[in-house]
């Protein structure tokens, strides 16, 4: 074939350049929600793409109260996630806990310390810590308190835990091999029994030798995020630990290593190293033994929790926002989500925060400032507590002026099949489904409202049946009514932002159009950063961005 890199005779030659190339497809952008959950890591933004994945990480139903007053509930966070993920692709969950919260943990005794009554670390082989913070993962009163039978003192005679539940867990060690320095570790569900084990994870043939490929910390992981503050008081997450977590439930820290346990010829290098292995019992005692998790704490969460329509200034799902101990976690979560490089979302939700409750409003103000500073997210706010009038909603709206947030009124009643009843929830717990449905069937610059895209099919009824005059009075103050119409049901009937000045940006679809446009330009142009400022680079940028804007114009 002729070489066409040089041309000796006259002629017209063409050369082709692909100026539309992008290395990867831009990932989906979803919502972010801040609020309490049943379990999960606290203050660590965690993306989930399905509701079942959310349940695995954060749970759903919990009980509060005691005796005849004990009831089962769901946090409003759960409803918001469930509604958004009906049509949406991903939502980032930030769990809130207050005060000195901590995860449950357990020590596994070493062979040398199995008969000791002490919990000194020199008696322990390794420590297992739950990835989930809070007391929900406590399955016993102590950790690895062994009785003479190799069972924990928290077990019944049938091998089930007195405090076992589907939300907590227990561990079991089996098949300790002194010749190889290996053992098996099983993570079991807290409500199983020795006769009907529910094994959630199993790690076979792990070792305490840090040079081995099956070193237990390498296999399971030991990383966690610690909340830190910089010199200016801004919170950030500091990663600790050397090995990524492969377990969905635990992390492991080895206390007694067995360095180079096996020689090259397959023999045990030092017989004393076997004393570091998990305790093995005599022939008259089972070779498998188990333990429970304890000492997990929810911190300063108030009991009983005020739920649903009982939410008030000093108790919103167990959080008294009049006290800094409770408000600070919300503020920390908001500040953490301000990191645009790390967390990508275009819709912010804080179900449980009510704007006409004084101390809630302070937190909401911080959240508004955060989305305005980011410039790429819209914030759904609940203006009033249950039972508030149209006039009270109007008063709340007078104190806000932003095109990065919107109000919806009134509260809505939904059916909860898991709890077997009807419950009142604020708009931010159900309206997210309208946004995700709108984005699925249309585009972000379409109005998330009306009979075609604004239906709330999960809703039974609204707290108040509004007249045309009520809707007009709300809309004048930039509050989006949730209306009820015969034969059509409950519908979002407005799409205004909280901007007071009349302009195109007092409409939610226009604000979301600009958010989407800025995100598209930013995500595509970053591949051209540090490229030469040439006509080819500029042409590439135009070719990348123009089709998106042409589509938005249609």
What are these regions (language model features)?
Residues 48, 200-205:
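Conserved aromatic
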Residues 153-178, 333-339:
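Intrinsically disordered, low-complexity regulatory segments in eukaryotic proteins
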Residues 143-150:
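Negatively charged, low-complexity tracts enriched in Asp/Glu with abundant Ser/Thr
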Residues 204-219:
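Short, cationic low-complexity segments
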Residues 1-125, 129-138, 176-184, 188-194, ...:
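Structured, hydrophobic secondary-structure cores that serve as assembly/anchoring elements
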């Amino acid at each position: 074939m002729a070489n066409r890199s040089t041309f000796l005779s006259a002629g017209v030659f063409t050369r082709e350049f692909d100026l539309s190339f992008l290395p990867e497809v831009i990932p989906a952008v979803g919502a972010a929600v801040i609020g309490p959950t049943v379990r999960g890591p606290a203050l660590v933004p965690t993306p989930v793409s399905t509701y079942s994945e959310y349940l695995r990480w954060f749970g759903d139903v919990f009980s509060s109260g005691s005796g005849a007053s004990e009831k089962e509930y769901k946090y409003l966070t759960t409803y918001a996630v469930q509604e958004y993920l009906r049509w949406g692709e991903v939502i980032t969950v930030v769990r809130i806990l207050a005060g000195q919260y901590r995860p449950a943990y357990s020590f596994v005794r070493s062979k040398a310390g199995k008969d000791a009554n002490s919990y000194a670390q020199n008696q322990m082989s390794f420590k297992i810590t739950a990835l989930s913070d809070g007391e929900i993962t406590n399955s016993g009163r102590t950790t690895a308190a062994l009785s003479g039978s190799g069972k924990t003192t928290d077990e019944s005679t049938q091998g089930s835990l007195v405090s076992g539940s589907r939300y907590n867990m227990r561990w079991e060690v089996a098949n300790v091999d002194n010749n190889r320095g290996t053992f098996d570790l099983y993570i079991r569900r807290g409500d199983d029994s020795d006769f009907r084990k529910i094994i959630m994870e199993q790690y076979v043939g792990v070792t305490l030798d840090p040079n081995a490929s099956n070193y237990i910390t390498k296999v399971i992981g030991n990383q966690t995020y610690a909340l830190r503050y910089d010199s200016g008081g801004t919170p950030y997450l500091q990663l600790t630990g050397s090995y990524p977590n492969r377990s969905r439930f635990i992390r492991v820290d080895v206390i007694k290593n067995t360095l180079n346990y096996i020689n090259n010829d397959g023999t045990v290098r030092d017989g004393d190293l076997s004393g570091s292995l998990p305790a093995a019992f005599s022939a008259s005692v089972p070779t498998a033994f188990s333990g429970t998790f304890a000492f997990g704490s929810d911190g300063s969460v108030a009991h009983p929790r005020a739920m649903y329509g009982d939410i008030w200034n000093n108790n919103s799902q167990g959080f008294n926002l009049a006290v800094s101990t409770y408000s600070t976690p919300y503020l920390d979560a908001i500040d953490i989500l301000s990191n645009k490089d790390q967390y990508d979302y275009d819709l912010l939700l804080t179900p449980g925060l009510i704007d006409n409750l004084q101390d809630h409003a302070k937190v909401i103000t911080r959240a508004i400032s955060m989305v305005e500073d980011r410039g790429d997210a819209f914030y759904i706010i609940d203006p009033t507590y249950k039972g508030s009038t149209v006039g009270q909603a109007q008063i709340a709206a007078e104190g806000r002026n932003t095109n990065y947030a919107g109000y919806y009124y009134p509260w809505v009643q939904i059916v909860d099949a898991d709890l077997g009843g009807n419950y009142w929830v604020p708009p931010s717990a159900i309206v997210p489904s309208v946004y995700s449905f709108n984005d699925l069937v249309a585009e972000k610059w379409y109005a998330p409202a009306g009979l075609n895209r604004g239906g709330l099919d999960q809703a039974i009824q609204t707290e108040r049946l509004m007249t045309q005059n009520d809707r007009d009075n709300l809309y004048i103050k930039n509050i989006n009514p949730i209306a009820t119409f015969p034969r059509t049901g409950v519908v979002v009937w407005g799409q205004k932002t909280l901007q007071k000045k009349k302009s195109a940006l007092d409409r939610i679809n226009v604000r979301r159009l600009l958010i989407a446009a800025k995100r598209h330009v930013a995500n595509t142009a970053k591949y051209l950063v540090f490229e030469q400022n040439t006509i080819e680079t500029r042409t590439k940028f135009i070719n990348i961005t123009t089709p998106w804007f042409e589509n938005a114009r249609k």
